[in-house]
Amino acid sequence: MKKKSILLIGALIVLGYILFHFTVSNNQTSNKQQPFPDFGHMVSPSVVQKDSIQLFKLSQNYPKSLPKTELPEFFKIDYQKNWKEYLLAVQKYCFEGNTNVEFRPELNKVRDWYHMPWQHYGANGREGFHGLTKEAPVGVGQLGRTQTYSTGGAWAVAFYNDKGGYTIGKVWQNHLDPDANKMEDMGGFPEGTVMFKLLFLSMPKDTVEKQIPYLRNGLWWKAYANYNFKSLDREVVDVVLIQMDVMIKDFRAPSGWILGNYKYNGQMNNSDKFYNLVPLGIMWGDDPENTTNTSNPIPDSTYINPKLKQTIINPDRNELPPSHLGWNGRLNGPMDNSMSSCYSCHSAAEYPQLSPISPLFDPKTSQYVPGSPQWMRWFQNYDCNSRFDEGAVPTDFSLQMAEALQNFDDWEVTKDGSFWNTYNVKEFKKHKDLSRRNRID
C-alpha cells in the first residue's frame, strides 16, 4: 500500500510537471510570434557556412505606434518647380547610412528602414544574399539599340522608412492573420512615408560591358538568381544596379503620392557608385486628358513629351542615357514597360488583385486600343485610397503590400514556407541541406 502511494505521488508530480511545462510553452508560443521568413531561395546552408556568406535579414521590428519623427527636409522643396533638387534630396535621405553597408538596415546607424514581409514565397521569391525578388523580363533593345541579350531580367529589393514600417506592422500585426482592411481603415500610409526600391539587371558582365555602355563602371551584387528569366533554376550570379524608384506620401500631391525614378550612368564616375543613379524624372499624376498613342520601346534618344502636365523628365542628355520612358512619355524606368507608367501600375494596387496592373497584362484587357476609354481606366488620377475595383481593398499604391497578402493566401493553401528556417545559424548542425532549388555544394 505504501509503495502504491509513493508511485501515485510520483506520478502526480510528473503529471504536474508536464502540465506546467505545457502551459508555459503554450503561453510562450501565444505571446511571441514566429518571425517572418527572411528569404525563400538560397545556396545550401553548408555553402553559407563554408564561404562565410552574410545572409539577408528581413527588417521586421516594425514600430508599434506612429513615429513622431518630423517630415524630411525635402518636404520644404517645391517638387514641381525644383524637381531635380527634390529628387537629389530624396536620394540622399534614402542613401544615408545605407550605401556603405550594402543596404542592410540592421547596420544602418542613421535611420531605420523596413522590408515588406511575405516577399520570400513562390518561384519569384526573395533570394538570400540581398533579399532580391524576381520582377520582370527585359526585352531585346529595351535598354538601348545595342542590347541584343534576350533573357535578362529585373531583380529588386524595397525599403520603407519608419512611418511606412508602422503601417506594415499594423496590417501584419498577427503574423498568421494579416488584416488588409487596416489599410483602408487607417487611410493608407501616413504622410511622410518614404519607400524606395533598387533594381538590378541579371546579365553576364562581359555582355553588359559590350551591349550597355552606360552600365560600364557598374555596381555589382551577388545574388541567387539566374541569367535566363524564364527559368525557375537559380545559381550564384552577379547582377548590376540599373534603376531606383521612390514613392513619397506627400499631401501636396493631388493623389497623395509623388513618384520618382533614377537611372544608372557609370560615366558620372562618383566615388560612391550608388550616386551614379541620376534623376530620370518625377510624376504626381497620370495626365488622363492625354490620350495620344506613342511609345519609344527601343530608345536611341529620350523622347520628352511637352504636353504632359504631371510628369517632368530630365532634359540633360549628358547626364541621362537614352531612355524609353512610359506610354506617351510618362515616367517609367528602364526596367519598366514602355506602354505603362509608374503612376498607372501603382494606382491599380489592390487586394485581391481583381484587375491587372496594366491593360497589357491580361487576355481580357490586352486588346484594348491604346487611348480608348477602356485603356484610359489605367491612366486616371485616382485618390490613393480609392478602390480600383469594387470588392477589393486599396493598398494605397503599394504593389508589394498587395502581393504580400496574396502570397500569404497562396501559402495558406499549401503550407509551404519554412525553407528559410534551415539558415538559422544556430540550427545549422540540427538540419540537413533542405534547399528545394539548385544547390551549389
Feature-to-residue mapping (PLM):
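N-terminal Sec-pathway targeting helices
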Residues: 1-13
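Functionally constrained cores in energy, signaling, and assembly domains
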Residues: 4, 17, 396
